[in-house]
């Protein structure tokens, strides 16, 4: 059953990703949305390899399929920091219009990438099982042991990059909520924060966290497309509807 849930997550992520590219083309190809889409390219793949693990089984093939998922996560996750700064700029937030501010977002992203990228070259994955799922991962809890002879694999590696990235995106989302009355990014990143934090410590931490990734990705895509459309309208070039609600949460406009 859990494998099926991850396969559903994979389909949802792929659908969201394709929809995002459609919105990107329709709304003037905003840089903010481009960065989000590049950063989220392999979210569907990460869920797919977990969902398919039970069918592939333990071995070199599943291990090899797992490596790109971790390499992608460690190298491209900080792109969301740049996306957060870009969407703040796109939304017309005064403090985000300064080049130094956008430069600061980029510097933070580079620093965070520099923290995580070395992990790619020291990657060591271990077999883990949960319900009917079979996957390779960096740490293995007692509840994820595949056999009585397997050992718990712990790590002192604190996910500082993921936490700081989420906090920065949430901060921009809250700023948009307060200054522009647009809550989608705050809600999406807030759900991601809760899913990976308060709800991400139990037996089913992984599927809950991956559900949070759907929320933050949706929040980013809808927000980027919304403000790109407003920018086109202000320039007198009104695009076709993007298929996302524009008034349910937002009561004002940029």
Question: What positions do the PLM features span?
Answer:
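Membrane-interfacial loop-to-transmembrane alpha-helix junctions, especially the N-terminal start
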Residues: 27-40, 96-104, 178-189
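Membrane-proximal helix-loop-helix units in multi-pass membrane proteins
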Residues: 85-166
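Non-cytosolic membrane-interface motifs at loop->transmembrane helix junctions
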Residues: 59-71, 132, 205-215
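Membrane-interface interhelical loops and short amphipathic "cap" helices
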Residues: 51-67, 126-140
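Hydrophobic transmembrane alpha-helical segments in integral membrane proteins
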Residues: 1-16
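C-terminal transmembrane-bundle signature of multipass membrane proteins
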Residues: 77, 167-253
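Aromatic-anchored segments of alpha-helical transmembrane domains
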Residues: 41-48, 108-118, 189-202
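Internal transmembrane alpha-helix with an interfacial aromatic "cap," most often the third helix
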Residues: 14-24, 41, 49-61, 71-105, ...
